[in-house]
Amino acid sequence: MARAVGIDLGTTNSVVAVLEGGDPVVVANSEGSRTTPSVVAFARNGEVLVGQPAKNQAVTNVDRTIRSVKRHMGTDWNTEIDGKKYTAQEISARTLMKLKRDAESYLGEDITDAVITVPAYFNDAQRQATKEAGQIAGLNVLRIVNEPTAAALAYGLDKGEKEQTILVFDLGGGTFDVSLLEIGEGVVEVRATSGDNHLGGDDWDERVVTWLVDKFKASSGIDLTKDKMAMQRLREAAEKAKIELSSSQSTSINLPYITVDADKNPLFLDEQLTRAEFQRITQDLLDRTRQPFQSVIKDAGISVGDIDHVVLVGGSTRMPAVSELVKEMTGGKEPNKGVNPDEVVAVGAALQAGVLKGEVKDVLLLDVTPLSLGIETKGGVMTKLIERNTTIPTKRSETFTTADDNQPSVQIQVFQGEREIASHNKLLGSFELTGIPPAPRGVPQIEVTFDIDANGIVHVTAKDKGTGKENTIRIQEGSGLSKEEIDRMIKDAEAHADEDRKRREEADVRNQAETLVYQTEKFVKEQREAEGGSKVPEDVLTKVDGAISEAKTALAGTDIGAIKAAMEKLGTESQALGQAIYEATQAEQAAGGGAGGADGSSSSSDDDVVDAEVVDDDRENK
């Protein structure tokens, strides 16, 4: 049975984990790190870089480097590079493809199945887009799981039979969730969830960038926001400063040659940022986490004192101000320190993959829908069929009627959100039920059914009870991709994977050829410069010289076939040279051995060959 992995597809970093003997293991990437930056870059030579290599070259390739694309999932965002438009799904798929490759390399087998996590507060369009990204990357997405639920699963499975209430506070690079869960006897049940899809560590970084821009403008009069390269350097410095301030009271931000003045003199940026100042400029961001926390406590119908454990998830929770706020809001409860906030979500996803594959037994995951679902009814009102925090999968039906006499059709508009007026919520999709027989208003019976699957993806059916006629919609308009577009993107991704493989193979062939040329050239030179002259005839060396020259010519070109052929020829000539040297050495030793037998001084010959495999033969010959 093929293995399934768990993937935390993050805004700033992503992680992949797999079950090994029933235990989850976080897989290190090809660079040796357990987290992979969610950064994709298109190099000017056509190569696509993903992860740390992409992040490393961001300053010199600003316009062709894409980060934090998770914030655009489920929207019509796209970016154009070399005349081709890329959607958020395609960019995310690049990160997923790298994680898939790294996991395959670790396991030594192909991977097709995955559980991918999303913020609990992701709407239907964002979930659908995440699933599409997985498909483009060549993955069969077994399940879309909420990040806090995955974290609770990873945290809570070994906590015994006693039922416990766990609060998961998840502040990542671009999204924020807070969820309340109950765990006991192998059941993980989400009681309530809330959050903000546009709040995360990136926002803290931007505040530091703005602070630096203002400071530099005040001292030099130059506005760095007009310089893309300078802004990229500022973002990287801001992220580094934020991380340092989690363990230090102050940090130095020193960026030499950040720009030049009117006289083309280089200017330096050198600022000292204290933790107190950092907390002052980001206080309002921190305060935005309070309302979702209070909503969850209210929706779950519990008091703060009922919380048994607090789990912090996401790298941004390492900021001291965040953990202090959580402690304050939970009545002084210390957050659990035994969980790695960067890895726990991927670990939970791997466990859920194990549950779905039958590798992990006796675990039941009961997740919830984060937002209410309903349709627009007369007067533009949002009529909710499924309330937020309803356990999924779920199915609800309600009967509606027509608003006008002899109305031949009804338009069903599906919305997600908490506002009373439908247009203030997110329109997920719409469809029409036609062919309703003429009748006075209020007579036709139209049954509308909402069905949410375990991934949190919505299906809606409208049925005329009188005629039995029905129409169904699977909500996917929000992601902006049709099946044809997804199929095209999958083919594109596969083509690029072949290109990448080809490029790697070409690089390997070049490296092998260059190494062979260098070693052979060195060998020939040593022979010619040897004391007493070369042991082999000059015509053998000349043949090798010719093969070296051919290999160098091939390496100067772009034809990999020619390089392979030249390398093969050079390999053959090198072997002939090695054979000639071996035979010459043997002949020399044989002559030396004969002389040694005559005068009784053969010890030096034996010393020369003491480590060689031919020693015993040599002694037998004597």
From Swiss-Prot:
PANTHER family for the chain: HEAT SHOCK PROTEIN 70KDA (PTHR19375)
Compositional bias ranges of the Acidic residues kind: 605-622
Domain of life of the source: Bacteria
One Pfam family it belongs to: HSP70
Known role: Acts as a chaperone.
Protein name: Chaperone protein DnaK
Skewed-composition ranges (Basic and acidic residues): 494-511
Family: Belongs to the heat shock protein 70 family.
Keywords: ATP-binding, Chaperone, Nucleotide-binding, Phosphoprotein, Stress response
